[in-house]
């Protein structure tokens, strides 16, 4: 299961759908997130936690044994393609920057 920033943030700030997300995570054989997704999540969480959220993110990655996917040139190519096919102003899906990164990670991870 590839995690995106919205799912990670939802879980860590305890949004109403976090229990459902945690259940899906528990059922997944592997959990992974692209390295840029972790940065995006940390940046959003810093607003919620009023400061440095790296420790929170690092604990989440450790606790759930999340595989961190490096973001390569191939990821860039797939993410850019996703933007031009499904990005804001291009398609009803309106994928944003983080969405395109998660899409690329999912596509290239199989």
Describe each PLM feature range:
Residues 4, 40, 99:
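Acidic active-site catalytic centers that drive phospho-/nucleotidyl reactions
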Residues 42, 48-49, 54-67, 72-74:
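Active-site-proximal, substrate-binding regions of enzyme catalytic domains
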Residues 27-28, 63-64, 109:
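Structured helix-beta-strand junction loops
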Residues 67-110:
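Active-site neighborhoods of divalent-metal-dependent phosphate/nucleic-acid chemistry enzymes
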Residues 1-33, 46-59:
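Short, well-structured N-terminal submotif of metal-dependent ribonuclease cores
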């Amino acid at each position: 299961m590839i995690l995106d920033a919205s799912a990670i943030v939802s879980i860590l700030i305890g949004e109403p759908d976090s229990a459902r997300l945690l259940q899906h995570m528990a059922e997944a054989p592997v959990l992974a997130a692209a390295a840029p997704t972790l940065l995006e999540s940390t940046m959003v969480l810093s607003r919620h936690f009023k400061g440095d959220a790296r420790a929170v993110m690092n604990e989440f990655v450790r606790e759930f044994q999340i595989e961190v996917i490096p973001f390569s040139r191939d990821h860039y190519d797939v993410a850019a393609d996703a933007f031009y096919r499904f990005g804001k102003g291009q398609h009803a899906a309106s994928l944003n920057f983080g969405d395109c990164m998660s899409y690329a990670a999912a596509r290239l991870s199989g």
